[in-house]
């Protein structure tokens, strides 16, 4: 079955072969890895385990610190890693403002920084980031479209929601804002594959009213209709709002809803059969390729400003494996 066990799609295969610098050199290198949490989803536990494996294979040292979902702890962790004199920082952002301040401090200390999973605003803050290791947003839209082509009836409509997590409706972003660019790429990837592979399915883009309160559910209720077969939500908040709106309209069982963000809530929605799936970077590839990329930087190699990683379509069939849990029936 195409989508079983993550339905892995390799977006960009990045292999540096043997690590960029020799094992003898790597033994003297220490990489600091900051993650938002090691709880709830299993996502970051898997990411850090693969990062540790990649560091061990290269004889490099890896220091892993969790922010426990607290920006204050994230700030302390970044300050501690910089004070400890790590050779490079890998950061999966929890709080953008905290990360920007941490990157600025690392830049001043001449410590190269790579971001994992998510970007932060760089233009106004003038921070320097060696590379962003993350999912290709266009490929996220393409994989979502492939799912809709296989699971939504011909003649149906797919609604693509355009919204950025944490922003209110009156917030204006520049066209070149990294969040706007990424969202546009997702929608373009979605549109291109639907048009080429299942032209009988109509794509409708919807601008959402707000993204953080109950008004979004009311807005979405007006966007959903009897002919809607699928909804693409670019973040967890919109996915959960869509679920509430579909349930209120008594359409939840007939609409396939996909999210493009892993959160404890979206994973729980898959497990309770309220959410069809999540399109996400695999934590394994983020951890492995993140370490490989930072070692290449430390070895003096030129790396791309953005390095794409593997994608997964997480469904009810693969959610336990994605969490790093056994799915054998009867096991606890």
Kindly label every feature range from the protein language model.
Residues 1-30, 104-111, 153, 327-332:
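Short, low-complexity disordered leader/linker segments with a strong preference
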Residues 27-29, 169-171, 175, 194, ...:
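Hinge/cleft segment of the Venus flytrap/periplasmic-binding protein
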Residues 42-58, 140-144, 169-201, 215, ...:
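Short, solvent-exposed amphipathic alpha-helices that sit
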Residues 72-86, 214-227:
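Short, well-structured alpha-helical segments in soluble
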Residues 96-139, 147-150, 157, 161-172, ...:
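Flexible loop/hinge segments that line or gate small-molecule binding clefts
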């Amino acid at each position: 079955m195409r989508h079983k066990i993550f339905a892995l799609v390799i977006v960009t295969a990045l292999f540096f072969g043997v690590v960029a610098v020799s094992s003898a050199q790597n033994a003297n290198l220490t990489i600091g890895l900051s993650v938002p949490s090691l709880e709830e989803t299993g996502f970051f536990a898997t990411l850090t385990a693969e990062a540790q494996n990649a560091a061990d294979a290269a004889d490099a040292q890896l220091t892993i610190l969790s922010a426990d979902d607290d920006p204050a702890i994230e700030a302390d962790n970044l300050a501690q890693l910089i004070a400890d004199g790590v050779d490079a920082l890998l950061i999966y952002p929890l709080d953008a403002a905290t990360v920007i301040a941490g990157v600025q401090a690392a830049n001043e200390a001449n410590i190269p920084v790579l971001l994992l999973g998510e970007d932060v605003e760089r233009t106004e803050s003038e921070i320097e980031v060696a590379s962003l290791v993350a999912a290709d947003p266009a490929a996220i839209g393409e994989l979502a479209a492939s799912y809709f082509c296989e699971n939504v009836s011909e003649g149906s409509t797919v609604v693509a929601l355009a919204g950025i997590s944490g922003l209110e409706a009156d917030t204006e972003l520049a066209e070149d804002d990294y969040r706007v660019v990424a969202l546009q790429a997702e929608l373009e990837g979605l549109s291109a594959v639907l048009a080429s592979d299942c032209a009988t399915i109509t794509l409708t883009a919807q601008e959402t009213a707000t993204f953080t309160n109950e008004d979004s559910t009311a807005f979405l209720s007006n966007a959903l209709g009897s002919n809607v077969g699928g909804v693409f939500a670019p973040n967890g908040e919109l996915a959960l709002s869509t679920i509430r709106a579909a349930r209120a309209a008594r359409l939840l069982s007939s609409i396939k809803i996909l999210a493009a963000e892993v959160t404890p809530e979206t994973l729980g929605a898959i497990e309770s059969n309220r959410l069809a799936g999540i399109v996400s970077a695999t934590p394994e590839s983020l951890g492995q390729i993140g370490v490989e990329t930072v070692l290449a930087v430390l070895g003096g190699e030129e790396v791309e400003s953005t390095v794409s990683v593997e994608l997964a379509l997480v469904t009810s069939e693969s959610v336990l494996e994605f969490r790093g849990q056994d799915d054998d029936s009867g096991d606890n």
